[in-house]
Amino acid sequence: MRTLFLSPSYLCNESCVFCPCHKIARRYTPVPIDLILSSIDDAMLRNNIEMVLISGGEPLLYKDLPKVINYAKQCGLKIGILSNSLKFADENFTQDFIEIVGNDFELTTAFHSCISDEHDSITNIKGSFEKSLRGVHCLIKSGVKVTIKYVINGLSYMYLPLFVEWVYATFPDTVSFVICNIDLCGEALENSEMTAVPFKESKQYLEKALDIVIKYSENGRHRNVSVFNTPLCTIDPYYWKFLRKYESEETMDALLLPSADSASPSFVRYDLKGDGGANFAPCAECCVQEICPGTWRQTAEYFGDSMFNPFN
């Protein structure tokens, strides 16, 4: 699906140790609403986009977010939001938000552990686990399509099977579940000694987690479960049916704030290639390269070519 990625602000109400953004990026002034709306127009004319995906920082802190959503909807575009859902813990806020923009958008919230103290230690915000959980339940109650996301990280990867059990015990099967390998950039790279985990170490926990998904499915619990940023050569082929490429990986436009080391103004970057995939030296020798999701570029650079086991 042709997508425009919007990052209107890097301001956030959490401070996750493996955030892909640098903390210094929060200093940038949010993108003006007029620039965002004109960027939607331009992306529609130039590339016939079908969806707007809004991230951050925390997009709910951007005061003009409802205007962005309603404008995109008027243009016939689908809306996706990546949010920690802390603000949705307030039922009154959620009701007001839904009254303004409707409930026909998709929202993804990441939980970093099913153990509240562990999650809070990663976000550096005490009580964030319970608030995000309340927020997600408020959204589900309001009819919003919700996805729960887990990023495989060095601090909690060994609890991934337990996390899967928690997802099935906590959320209805209409809630999708995605597992992603970590993008080692920004704060994640700065804190790599505790955030990075080699694929060979997380493999057994990921496979056990997917065994649990299969068990639930066989018992009639059918949930949309996907795994991203995971090369085929790092997991048993039995589990390949769960691995996905991002739909927008080869077809994304983006309106981004400048990077932490740049003073350039925001502008739309068109026809961006995904920052990764199966494009590394060992991948060229692999017979399944064309169907492989690959992984993040900086993650592959961090672990080196030895992480790959190409199929010949």
Question: Where do the model's predicted regions map?
Answer:
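Radical SAM/AdoMet-radical enzyme domain recognition
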Residues: 37-53, 62-181
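Radical SAM enzyme [4Fe-4S]-AdoMet core and its adjacent flexible, acidic
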Residues: 36, 125-137, 141-271, 275
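A short acidic, helix-capping loop that chelates divalent metal ions and anchors anionic groups
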Residues: 25-27, 115-122, 186-191
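Disulfide-bonded cysteines in secreted/extracellular proteins and peptides
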Residues: 12, 16-19, 233, 283-286, ...
